A protein has these predicted regions:
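Short glycine/threonine-rich loop-to-helix capping motif typified by GTGT followed
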Residues: 21-28, 58-70, 157-163, 240-245
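Active-site neighborhood of glycoside hydrolase catalytic domains
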Residues: 41, 73-77, 81
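Glycine/serine-rich loop-strand microenvironments at binding/catalytic pocket rims
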Residues: 40-51, 62, 93-104
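Charged (often Lys/Glu-rich) extended helix/loop segments that serve as interaction or gating elements
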Residues: 72, 83-306
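Glycine-rich beta-strand-to-loop/alpha-helix junction loops that act as flexible
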Residues: 16-18, 49-58, 89-94, 150-152
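Short connector loops at secondary-structure junctions
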Residues: 11-16, 47-54, 215, 219-228
Length: 306
């Protein structure tokens, strides 16, 4: 850098960690600030620290729901309750002589600190090597620009992914499989499991009637089903965990996956077996009315905002 200082506009330092740990990020920030001092000593003029993204979101309203579900999954892995997943998929966990080993490989669907509160917690961390001052006060006192790259937290509670039910079949074990006109890649983030139950919108005829075989077979107890994609591959299970419904869906019904904007709806989408990637639609509310256009035709209307 020193040899090419005339060719470089040295802004500062950046990190982007694959972790949501506040403590690990605080260590990275402290390292950046120490590097700031080193750069200043070498007559550079750094002014920016970019701390990347990783600002968590909540996909569930109730923390206890998530704790109860993950506890039940672990019990199933240990064999103390019936399996809740396809072929007892353990999501990184295993049972060894009655003890649980490994880690639950999943994004936490509930967290007490998300979005802005997560950032505030990070900026409140104290650095012993820098006079025990907080990250925020050091940056403010030295006029250091803070750059962030939030991803899913910017679109929290937005976006839906809609698939149509093609058919309902039974596995060799007698488990209902709801086959959708989508594939796992259409609603998957780096092959992570999605633990939010979808919404079922039933198909009705022109008179609003709905008469199906599934309706006549509805049960008092919830029915456990698996959602499968259309690639004819066992790995193409949209959900590898069992989802419990009031009754079986029927062909033509719509299955709606909510809050899917943040990396889920098309992050891993592909054109497998020559299927085109699903079209995206932008929905806008103006003057109390909803309108929509194809996403590629959408133009933000900031100039119309007060």
């Amino acid at each position: 850098l020193e040899a090419n200082r005339k060719k470089i506009d040295f802004l500062g330092f950046s990190f982007h960690l694959d972790t949501v740990s506040v403590l690990e990020r605080a260590v990275a920030m402290e390292n950046c600030m120490e590097l700031f001092e080193e750069a200043l000593a070498r007559d550079f003029e750094p002014r920016v620290i970019n701390i990347g993204g990783g600002y968590k979101v909540n996909y569930l309203e109730n923390e206890q729901d998530w704790n109860d579900y993950t506890s039940a999954l672990k019990e199933a892995v240990l064999g103390t309750r019936p399996s809740m997943t396809w072929h007892n998929n353990a999501f990184g966990m295993s049972s060894d002589k009655g003890k649980l080993k490994g880690n639950f490989n999943s994004y936490s669907y509930f967290d007490t600190q998300t979005g802005g509160s997560f950032l505030q917690e990070l900026l409140s961390q104290r650095f012993p090597n820098l006079g025990d001052a907080t990250a925020g006060s050091i940056m403010q006192g030295n006029m250091i620009e803070l750059w962030i790259e939030p991803g899913r937290s910017l679109v929290d509670q937005t976006g839906i992914t809609v698939a149509r039910v093609n058919s309902v079949r039974m596995s060799s074990r007698g488990e209902p499989i709801v086959c959708l006109n989508m594939k796992r890649q259409d609603i998957s983030f780096l092959d992570q499991e999605i633990f939010v139950d979808p919404i079922i919108i039933e198909k009705h005829d022109e008179e609003g009637a709905r008469q199906t075989e599934q309706d006549s077979q509805s049960k008092e107890e919830p029915i456990g089903v698996y959602f499968a994609g259309n690639l004819c591959l066992e790995s193409d299970l949209v959900h590898r965990h069992m989802t419990y419904l009031d009754k079986l869906p029927s062909p033509g019904d719509l299955v709606v996956f909510v809050n899917s904007s943040g990396y889920f709806m098309d992050f891993s989408a592909s054109t497998s077996i020559m299927q085109p990637v699903a079209e995206k639609v932008a929905v806008m509310e103006r003057d109390g009315k909803f309108t929509w256009v194809m996403d590629k035709q959408y133009v933000p209307f900031w100039e119309c905002m007060p």
